[in-house]
């Protein structure tokens, strides 16, 4: 067996005309098969790490076989081989499975009608909203919508509840007393797709050249590797190439397992359909109703719209929120404010649609490092590895001012390859401590290419900060720094919000979703007995009819009593009974309070009532004849006579004004005489303790009497003051009023 000796293997790192050589080793490998037993040959195995996004001539492998040893004699080969290896950008492929179509914006149509003409039954020949039919010509269940009627309380002018889409007027049974609510669909429809688990995909192209004695390079053949075909062999069996594996990307693909992909699909002439992928969206699966039975979700159907809970007491459109059109328009607003959208594809990364092996695929480009190991086994004696070192600069760079934790920070940098060769560059970032680290990026630029690089920027602090800084460094493939720029930017404090009230938001009421509807849910008004009948709620229907009959009977009775003159006397009788009962209770409470006040406030010495004697007399009421014993205690006959005279005059004064209540009693323990008189607002209490007559402060005529201004008072006050003056009563105090008998 011949022994083939290798020469040295060189790796060339070239910058224009300057080259650096690094030695490498070789390995020996034998292949043994049943067809060619013991067929051993010496191979050179080249292991390469290819980065993501490398382009033609960025990384080139040149292998030259120049000599071998035969029986100890070295022989120079006339021809050599050259291998050029390139790798396409790494992408993530997401297979799509069609789910179903969804309307962009379901709409509610409101038709004004009357109580007797609105029809929404499934067996009605011509319901107000009309029926919709499927492709087989069959009526679609619940496509007839539903009717809402003004309730009895609305017709009587007493209703104050929200009525869906209608304005109910008192005594109106004509147009506007009922409305029909119909579900209509907008012209634009979206197609939804399930998103499958991603697969990484890239291609590696290996060009094999031969170089003759005239140093002419001739293409011999091309090997094309991919994730679908990881191993290839040249036609002359001189070269074998394999993909060993790919490292996990430093920026992995987006996790789309919880989303549906939706894209405008028809009509084909719709402007949004013609926009292509820029109008596609990722929407969370929880925002959809696949059976159409849930309100305020994408895909709500006729049944979901018609069977919504308490439909007639909800605002118009209450079941048709959070639709695809709403999501799209909200993202347009965010984009107009230079903010990140929530649903459009760019919210998750850089995506495209491709056809792969006859299947519709969603493709995401990966911007981070995703190194791939490949091997090339060749019959060679010397290998040169060439890497172009570029010359580049950062022409522009900036970071916008943004709110902390808002996700709206963005770094933009323009990087240019100023060399004449395609080359690899590395961007490194060094930022202040409160800025979250930014991942370094590898760039592969063609000659004189200007590349616009951007990435998001975040800070770790909630508070505002001035002059945050980030330094951007540009390196070549072996770490030589080519350029450096420093960026200053400001951040504002985080704007905290809440949906639970106080200073940060408005409290929102919770919503309960019920799996089944009760009779009260199906019919918004208790008085709508026809609604209960149509819903099969017979018991509730009879309750409603009985209540209506009761109200009608009560109204008829009131009208009858009023017409025959009985209503006013009955009302007066009831009011009188109520007022008397309440007045009696108030006077009892007032007696107790005033007694206690007098006992605590009066401290005058007894002047004429030192000896106790008993006397009783009768007080007669004009309307009701009652007799009460009045026990008085006086120390002298003159004091007794004078006090009795004053009491009699006051009694006569009350009789003059037709008081409807008069009584007197005596508290034996405190010797307080209580006199009650004057009906309604003129009621007052007159006390006598020893030689002092007291009028409580809460008397309605106290201000007039206490100020002793009869010219401003009523006739009653003037008469009272005449009694005071005639009997030479001395005013001791006006608030409260104390009258001293002299």
UniProtKB/Swiss-Prot annotation:
The gene is HAP2. It comes from Tetrahymena thermophila. It is a single-pass type I membrane protein. It comes from the Eukaryota. The region that is important for membrane fusion binds to lipids and can insert itself into lipid membranes. It is unstructured in an aqueous environment and assumes a more ordered, beta-stranded conformation in the presence of lipid membranes. Keywords: Cell junction, Cell membrane, Disulfide bond, Fertilization, Lipid-binding, Membrane, Signal, Transmembrane, Transmembrane helix. HAP2/GCS1 family members mediate membrane fusion between gametes in a broad range of eukaryotes, ranging from algae and higher plants to protozoans and cnidaria, suggesting they are derived from an ancestral gamete fusogen. They function similar to viral fusogens, by inserting part of their extracellular domain into the lipid bilayer of an adjoining cell. Pfam families: HAP2-GCS1. It is found in: Cell membrane; Cell junction. One of its GO terms (cellular component) is cell-cell junction. Belongs to the HAP2/GCS1 family. Disulfide bonds join 30-40, 118-147, 129-182, 148-312, 150-168, 295-319, 431-470. Residues 1-19 form the signal peptide. The chain crosses the membrane at residues 541-561. InterPro entries: HAP2/GCS1 (IPR040326), HAP2/GCS1_dom (IPR018928). GO terms for biological process: fertilization; plasma membrane fusion; single fertilization. GO terms for molecular function: fusogenic activity; lipid binding. Residues 20-540 are extracellular. During fertilization, required for the formation of intercellular membrane pores and subsequent exchange of gametic pronuclei between cells. Probably initiates the formation of intercellular membrane pores by inserting part of its extracellular domain into the cell membrane of the adjoining cell in the mating pair. Mating requires the presence of HAP2 on at least one of the two cells. Mating efficiency is high when HAP2 is present on both cells, and is strongly reduced when HAP2 is present on only one of the two cells. Residues 152-179 are annotated as: Important for membrane fusion. This is Hapless 2. Residues 562-742 are cytoplasmic.
């Amino acid at each position: 067996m011949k022994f083939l000796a290798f020469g040295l293997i060189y790796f060339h790192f070239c910058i224009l005309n300057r080259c650096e050589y690094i030695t490498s080793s070789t390995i020996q490998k034998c292949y043994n098969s049943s067809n060619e037993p013991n067929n051993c040959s010496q191979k050179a195995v080249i292991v390469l790490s290819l980065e993501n996004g490398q382009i033609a001539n960025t990384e080139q492998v040149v292998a030259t076989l120049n000599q071998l040893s035969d029986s100890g004699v070295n022989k120079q080969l006339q021809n050599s081989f050259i291998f050029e290896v390139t790798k396409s950008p790494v992408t993530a492929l997401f297979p799509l499975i069609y789910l179903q179509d969804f309307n962009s914006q379901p709409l509610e149509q409101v038709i004004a009608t009357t109580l007797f003409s609105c029809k929404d039954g499934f067996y009605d020949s011509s319901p107000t909203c009309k029926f919709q039919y499927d492709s087989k010509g069959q009526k679609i269940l619940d496509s007839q919508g539903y009717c809402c009627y003004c309730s009895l309380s609305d017709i009587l002018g007493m209703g104050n509840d929200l009525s869906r889409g209608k304005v109910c007027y008192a005594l109106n049974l004509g147009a506007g007393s009922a409305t029909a609510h119909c579900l209509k669909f907008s012209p634009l429809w979206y197609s939804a797709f399930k998103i499958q688990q991603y697969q990484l995909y890239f291609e590696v192209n290996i060009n094999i050249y031969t170089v003759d004695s005239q140093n002419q390079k001739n293409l011999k053949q091309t090997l094309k590797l991919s994730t679908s075909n990881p191993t290839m062999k040249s036609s002359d069996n001189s070269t074998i190439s394999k993909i060993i594996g790919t490292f996990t990307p430093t920026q992995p693909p987006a996790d789309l397992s919880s989303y549906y992909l939706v894209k405008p699909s028809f009509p084909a002439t719709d402007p949004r359909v013609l926009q292509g992928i820029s109008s596609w969206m990722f929407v969370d699966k929880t925002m959809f109703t696949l059976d159409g039975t849930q309100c305020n979700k994408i895909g709500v159907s006729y049944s979901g719209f018609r069977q919504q809970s308490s439909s007639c007491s909800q605002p118009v459109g209450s079941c048709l929120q959070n639709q695809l059109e709403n999501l799209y328009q909200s993202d347009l607003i965010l984009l107009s404010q230079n903010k990140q959208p929530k649903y459009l594809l760019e919210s998750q990364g850089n995506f495209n649609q491709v056809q792969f092996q006859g299947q519709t695929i969603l493709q995401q480009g990966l911007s981070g490092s995703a190194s791939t190991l490949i091997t090339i086994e060749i019959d060679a004696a010397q290998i040169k590895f060439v890497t172009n070192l570029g010359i580049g600069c950062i022409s522009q760079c900036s970071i916008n001012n943004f709110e902390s934790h808002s996700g709206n920070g963005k770094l933009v940098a323009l990087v240019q390859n100023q060399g004449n060769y395609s080359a690899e560059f590395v961007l490194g970032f060094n930022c202040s401590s409160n800025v979250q680290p930014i991942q370094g990026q590898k760039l592969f630029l063609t000659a004189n290419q200007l590349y616009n690089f951007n990435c998001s920027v975040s800070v770790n602090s909630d508070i505002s900060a001035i002059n945050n800084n980030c330094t951007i460094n540009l390196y070549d493939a072996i770490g030589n720094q080519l350029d450096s720029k420093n960026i200053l930017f400001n951040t504002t404090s985080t704007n905290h919000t809440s949906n639970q009230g106080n200073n940060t938001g408005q409290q929102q009421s919770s919503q309960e979703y019920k799996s089944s509807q009760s009779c009260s849910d199906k019919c918004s008004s208790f008085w709508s007995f026809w609604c209960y009948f149509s819903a099969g709620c017979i018991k509730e229907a009879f309750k409603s009819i009985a209540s209506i009959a009761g109200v009608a009977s009560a109204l008829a009775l009131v009208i009858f009593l009023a017409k025959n003159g009985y209503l006013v006397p009955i009302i007066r009788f009831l009011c009188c009974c109520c007022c008397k009962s309440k007045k009696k209770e108030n006077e009892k409470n007032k007696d107790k309070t005033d007694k206690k006040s007098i006992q605590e406030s009066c401290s005058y010495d007894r002047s004429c009532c030192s000896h106790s004697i008993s006397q009783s007399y009768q007080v007669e009421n004009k309307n009701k004849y009652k007799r009460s014993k009045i026990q008085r205690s006086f120390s002298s006959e003159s004091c007794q006579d004078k006090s009795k005279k004053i009491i009699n005059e006051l009694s006569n004064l009350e009789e003059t004004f037709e008081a409807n209540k008069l009584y007197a009693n005596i508290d034996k323990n405190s010797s307080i005489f209580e006199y009650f008189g004057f009906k309604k607002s003129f009621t007052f209490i007159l006390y006598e303790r020893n030689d002092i007559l007291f009028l409580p402060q809460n008397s309605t005529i106290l201000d007039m009497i206490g100020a002793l201004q009869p010219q401003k008072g009523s006739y009653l006050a003037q008469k009272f003051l005449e009694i005071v003056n005639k009997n030479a009563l001395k005013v001791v105090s006006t608030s409260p009023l104390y009258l001293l008998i002299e």
